[in-house]
A protein has these predicted regions:
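Extracytoplasmic gate region of multi-pass secondary transporters
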Residues: 38-94, 182
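Flexible cytoplasmic inter-helical loops of multi-pass small-molecule transporters
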Residues: 7-30, 224-229
Length: 229
């Protein structure tokens, strides 16, 4: 599908719109003001923390289930595969709900609470029912916030398409680094201490940034003006 779009898609742009919306390069000062905005920093931290845990679990849970919970690799892989499967429906819900209720911090707080509760259950509990329930809830929490994450930058004051692109690039860069780092971190911790659990816990705590971002977002979007002298 992506290859077909790349080869066949053609932009539909009116000549009048091209003349009225010139593309201007951003200065370093403008770029810095965009990426240092408190709301943008919260978005970056939230997505990076969630993906730190998500990538660690999807990379290592099958091996963990096999070595620690005495499951077959195929069963461990099936259980882990529920995470992205549930995410398909969660991200759709995450796109529909804000369109009805607006871009509200609750769409960070609620998924953040799901992640805080369900994350540890995927590896600390040996009960199969708890594991399945934790995987499903974690899958919802790890994807429900994504549409709001990508839409919120467009609602920030003074944003232009160029600035929104900078924000998205910043988010993707940091999140990509977290996705690269987390499996290495869990693997290194396992080699040193002989257990996956400490690495999973570290990555799980990092995912709490989503809940923290939801709590702090109202203040970042509406900063209190400094008192006059």
């Amino acid at each position: 599908g992506a290859l077909t779009w790349t080869l066949l898609a053609r932009p539909v742009v009116k000549a009048s719109s091209l003349a009225s919306t010139p593309v201007t390069a951003l200065t370093r000062k403008e770029i810095w003001s965009v990426i240092s905005h408190p709301a943008v920093l919260l978005l970056v931290a939230a997505d990076g923390g969630v993906l730190l845990q998500y990538t660690a679990l999807t990379s290592w849970l099958p091996t963990f289930f096999n070595e620690v919970r005495d499951m077959s690799l195929s069963r461990g892989g099936f259980i882990t595969g529920i995470l992205p499967f549930v995410g398909v429906f969660a991200v759709l819900a995450g796109g529909i709900l804000p369109s009805r209720f607006g871009l509200k911090p609750i769409f960070f707080v609620a998924p953040g609470m799901l992640i805080v509760v369900a994350g540890p259950g995927t590896f600390l509990s040996g009960n199969l029912i708890v594991i399945y329930a934790s995987i499903v809830v974690l899958g919802i929490g790890s994807w429900l916030y994504v549409p709001t994450l990508l839409s919120l930058p467009m609602a920030l004051p003074g944003m232009t398409p160029e600035k929104v692109g900078i924000v998205w690039g910043f988010i993707i860069t940091v999140s990509g680094f977290c996705m690269f780092l987390s499996p290495l971190l869990v693997g290194a911790v396992r080699d040193i201490w002989g257990s996956f659990t400490p690495g999973f816990i570290v990555c799980g705590v990092a995912a709490w940034t989503l809940l923290l971002a939801g709590i702090l977002m109202p203040r970042a979007l509406n900063p209190t003006p400094a008192p006059g002298r």
